[in-house]
Regions:
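Long, contiguous binding/interaction regions
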Residues: 1-76
Length: 76
């Protein structure tokens, strides 16, 4: 199992959707929130995703399909 750290950026209605819940329920990934900041109009979360690389890619593609910005980060 590999770990991928990402920053997800939310705008508008997307910040009210249960995206992190959906990732854990619909994809074979384990999520861990490292940091987050959510305001009235925008928000972001740094998130670890543990899982097989193909499943992590599927989860991130789901985020992109919801107009959520996805940036892969280097491990600290």
């Amino acid at each position: 199992m590999a770990r991928t750290t990402v920053r997800l950026t939310f705008r508008g209605d997307a910040r009210n959707d249960p995206i992190i819940y959906r990732l854990g329920q619909d994809y074979k990934v384990v999520t861990n929130i490292r940091r987050a900041d959510v305001g009235n109009d925008t928000g972001w979360v740094e998130l670890d995703l543990d899982g097989e690389p193909a499943e992590v890619d599927r989860a991130l593609e789901y985020c992109r399909s919801r107009s959520i910005g996805v940036d892969k980060l280097e491990h600290p």
